[in-house]
Amino acid sequence: MTTPAGTAGYGEAAEQLAVQYESVSFAEVHRELYDRYPAPPASVLDIGAGTGRDAAALAALGHRVVAAEPTPELRAVGQRLHAGSGVRWVTDALPDLPSLVADGERYDLVLLTAVWMHLAPDEHPSAMAALTRLLAPAGRLALTIRHGPVPAGRRMFDLPAEPTIALAADHGLRLLHRATRADLHGRDEVHWTALLFEREALSGAPAVRSRSEAADIGPSSR
C-alpha cells in the first residue's frame, strides 16, 4: 500500500502519540455522540484507529470491531497495548479504502475520529463514497473534524463542517447530530466538531437501535 500523505509524521512519533492518545478515554472522546451509537452487539469499523483505544473499548462493550490503521508503527503499538481485546486489525487507508471495500463487509457503525482533516478537499468525494459503501442500511458514521493551527510536519486542513455535511447528504447520509467541544489535551487554539450521520434504511428492514433507544426498552417490554 502506498503511504498516505496524511500519515506524515505519525510513524516516527508512534510511542509518544500512544501516550497522548491513551491519556484520554473513549467515553471522553465520544461523549457528544456515544448515546446515539448502535447498541451491542453491532459490527463496527474504526478507520484510522491509531493505537486502538476506541476499538478496544467498543470490543469490551460487546461489539465486533475491525480497526483499520495505515501507519505500521501505530498499528504495532495498538496490537501490543490491546492484545486480547478481540479487535481485528487491517491495513487500509482513505480516500478509497480499497481492501475494506473489496472485502464486502458492511458495518452498523463507522468511526472516523481525528482523521477527516488529513484529507485534501479534493479527496473528500471519493472518501465519502467509500465510507457510504461500507455502511449497512441504517448504519451510522461518526466523524470528528479538528479546527486550529496545523502542527509542524503534519498534513492537515482546517475546514468548516458545512461542506462535509453537504457532501454526506449527496451520498444519502442524513445528519443526526452535530456538536462542538474544546480540545481534550488542553490546547486552547484547537477545538473540534463532532458529526453523526445515518444511512437510509432499506424499506421494511429493522432500524439499528442506538444505546439510548435500547436503554428505553426495559426487560419486561422486550
Indicate where each model-derived feature is located.
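Class I (Rossmann-like) S-adenosyl-L-methionine-dependent methyltransferase catalytic domain
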Residues: M1-A102, L119-S126, A130, R140-R222
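Short, conserved loop/helix-junction motifs that constitute active-site signature segments
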Residues: R133
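Conserved acidic residues
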Residues: D108
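A conserved beta-strand element that flanks and buttresses the S-adenosyl-L-methionine
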Residues: L111
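Short catalytic micro-motifs in class I SAM-dependent methyltransferases
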Residues: A114-V115
